[in-house]
Curated annotation (Swiss-Prot):
Keywords: ATP-binding, DNA damage, DNA repair, DNA-binding, Helicase, Hydrolase, Isomerase, Nucleotide-binding. Involved in DNA double-strand break (DSB) repair. Probably acts with NurA to stimulate resection of the 5' strand and produce the long 3' single-strand that is required for RadA loading. Has DNA-dependent ATPase activity and bidirectional DNA helicase activity. Loads on either a 3' or a 5' DNA tail for subsequent DNA unwinding; has no activity on blunt-end DNA. It comes from Sulfolobus acidocaldarius (strain ATCC 33909 / DSM 639 / JCM 8929 / NBRC 15157 / NCIMB 11770). ATP binds at residues 142, 151-156, 459-460. Its EC number is 5.6.2.3, 5.6.2.4. ATPase activity is slightly stimulated by either circular single- or double-stranded (ds)DNA with a weak preference for dsDNA. Gene3D superfamilies: P-loop containing nucleotide triphosphate hydrolases. This is DNA double-strand break repair helicase HerA. It catalyses: Couples ATP hydrolysis with the unwinding of duplex DNA at the replication fork by translocating in the 5'-3' direction. This creates two antiparallel DNA single strands (ssDNA). The leading ssDNA polymer is the template for DNA polymerase III holoenzyme which synthesizes a continuous strand; ATP + H2O = ADP + phosphate + H(+); Couples ATP hydrolysis with the unwinding of duplex DNA by translocating in the 3'-5' direction. The keyword Hydrolase applies. GO terms for biological process: DNA repair. It comes from the Archaea.
């Protein structure tokens, strides 16, 4: 059914149509001309009246016009159409613009299915249709950003994507910043404790956690020698059955401090030795909740076909940063090991999800996580490690990392500076699509990148289970607290 006609001048990229009725932005249309069938996307809809145009300066004239019956006031509806591709099986770019008068009609479900339903995993439906949207999985190795304002559907998107991935046997690891997923009803959950085992830390990683920089030569040398010596001793003791992991948990740092004292006996090293001892004591106190030698290697705790969740909600930012950075390092290095020797390391590809990425991957702060997330963004594709970053503050993200997220699922974004930042760091996001981000409803998104053939405006499927991070019902909680207060008061009166 024809809904309008092309008017004015057009290019091979966009055109303007005058419409017979209001059509929401985000709908897909078909233009047929020069023997081709062209798929277009309505990016903007606006109305006006030749009687009440922008040049009108007389308010009394408007009042007189308003006295007419509404259906006697002439008005028009126009739309901007982004021309996407030819529906020729190859989805090539149009090479000729449409001429004025070219009819515009809504695309049929059958036409849209050839473009948007040919992927591997369904995550929703096209806005305004029953056409399911399936994304391609292999391009996720080139990473994904899920960006949105608070309350626009980020957690639901992560839940749906995770659920659909494990349904086909995939593996995903979510760093659960707010505890939304570990206590959810997501299927195939595998909960991993947020623990650090010092025996699996590299010297550089341990020194960084101690805040000893490599250019602090003497301090770095002291910790390198003592840490390596202690790890070797402990590993030998474990092999020979001379100690228990529980015992090591209680005396690891004391043994390390003894070795540091021995290493720093030279008078010239006394000041550096004392500095290292202070830093070890600070480290043991600051990270006491997450240090655990009984924990083992996190690689052995990640399961294939599971939604692996690390619950970080009880930790402070320093501890979260340490955990996420270490796990990302172990995952990347372990996948590299597997590439060289098939029976070692992590034996299957994995997608890692970093929530609150504007905190852990901030453009203004050099976090531990940023180093290893950056490495995965650059190298992960070759070794089957995908990075998914989730944020409600895109402008706070490190530009280099965000620009390497080839794929993006962008839900509602209202803040102009956020939209501008996303546009600047996205090769395949056009300005007209970015302009429409603020008009999206909750759960609606624009998908760009190699996971889809074309920019896709979608309603993400609703996760039907329970996530734990929903906003509290204040009135219900106040009411319940009041009732409990009354009960306690009554019990006290009985006593």
């Amino acid at each position: 059914m024809t809904i309008g006609y092309i008017i004015g001048s057009a290019t091979i990229n966009e055109a303007t149509a005058i419409l017979e009725q209001k059509i929401r932005a985000g709908y897909y249309v078909i233009l047929e001309y020069d023997g081709d069938k062209i798929l277009g996307l309505i990016t903007n809809v606006y109305t006006g009246s030749p009687l009440l145009d922008d040049n009108l300066n007389d308010v009394k004239f408007v009042q007189r016009i308003k006295q007419l019956e509404a259906n006697k006031i002439p008005f028009f509806i126009k739309a901007r159409i982004k021309l996407l591709c030819k529906l020729d099986g190859k989805f090539t770019q149009p090479d000729l613009p449409p001429v004025a008068g070219t009819p515009v009609r809504l695309a049929s479900d059958e036409e849209l299915s050839t473009v948007f339903s040919a992927g591997d995993v369904r995550i929703g439906k096209l806005i305004g249709s029953n056409v399911e949207v399936k994304i391609r999985l292999n391009p996720l190795s080139r990473h994904l950003a899920i960006l949105a304002a608070t309350g626009s559907g980020k957690s639901n998107t992560v839940a749906i994507l995770s659920q659909r991935l494990v349904e086909i046997g995939g593996s995903i690891l979510i760093f659960d910043y707010h505890g939304e997923y570990y206590d959810s009803t997501l299927p195939n959950l595998n909960i991993i404790e947020p623990k650090l085992n010092p025996l699996y830390l590299s010297v550089n990683e341990f020194a960084t956690l101690l805040e000893i920089r490599e250019n602090a030569n003497i301090q770095y040398r002291i910790i390198r020698r003592t840490f390596n010596q202690l790890k070797e001793e402990i590993n030998n003791e474990i092999k020979e059955g001379k100690t228990s992991l529980a015992e090591l948990n209680s005396n690891f740092f004391e043994r390390l401090k003894v070795k540091i004292e021995e290493e720093g006996r030279n008078e010239k090293r006394k000041e550096s030795k004392d500095e290292v001892l202070n830093k070890v004591e600070d480290f043991a106190e600051r990270y006491s909740d997450i240090i655990d030698i009984t924990f083992g290697d996190v690689i052995n705790k990640i399961k294939l076909g599971k939604i692996n969740v690390v619950n970080l909600s009880s930790l402070d930012e320093d501890a979260i940063d340490a955990i996420v950075a270490h796990y990302l390092r172990r995952i990347l290095t372990s996948r590299k090991e597997n590439k060289i020797k098939k029976d070692s390391g992590l034996k299957f590809p994995i997608l890692t999800v970093v929530e609150e990425a504007h905190v852990l991957l901030s453009k203004d702060t050099n976090t531990l996580t940023k180093k290893w997330a950056g490495r995965i963004a650059r190298e992960g594709r070759k070794f089957g490690v995908g990075l998914i970053i989730v944020s409600q503050r895109p402008k706070g993200l490190d530009e280099n990392i965000l620009s390497q997220m080839t794929n993006k699922i962008i839900l509602k974004i209202v803040e102009p500076s956020d939209k501008k930042y996303v546009l600047e760091t996205s090769d395949n996001l056009s300005e007209d699509l970015a302009d429409g981000l603020s008009s999206l409803d909750t759960g609606e998104a624009i998908i760009i990148g190699n996971v889809v053939k074309l920019p896709t405006i979608i309603k993400i499927d609703k996760f039907e289970g329970k996530l734990s991070g929903s906003d509290p019902n204040l009135t219900e909680e106040w009411k319940r607290a009041k009732e409990e207060e009354i009960v306690h008061s009554d019990v006290s009166d009985w006593g």
